[in-house]
Amino acid sequence: MKMTTSEIDGIRNFIALLNSKKDSMVVVEGKRDSAALKKLGFSGMICEFHSFKGLVKFADSMDSYKRLILLLDLDRKGRYLTSKIISQLEHRIRIDLSFKRKLAMIMRGKIRHIEDLSMYESPE
């Protein structure tokens, strides 16, 4: 897919801002989402939701983190999982949805899955 200069700059700034959140765990749905973020230069901690056997085990393993940045897909399943995670963890851990909103604004609906970001590699 072809990206505009503003989208490329937006993604670079997005990844830089995400990298600056050292005390946070970024939560994605699966391996391809994780790989896409790493391919774009993300170097922080990533947790793949689907590597856990259910929401309760996921929630129990997140207790040691101060903040979770949820970057689940922008589709129906991603919205459902986001609401379930929030209802399970909102009283125990700070949950940050601002990055999900920023990404949606940058991409203006062009992507619905985090893994699709890997198609947007830009030449340096």
Residue ranges and their predicted role:
Residues 31-40, 45, 49-124:
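TOPRIM fold recognition
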Residues 1-25, 31-35, 58-59:
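Phosphate-handling DNA/RNA-contact segment within nucleic-acid enzymes
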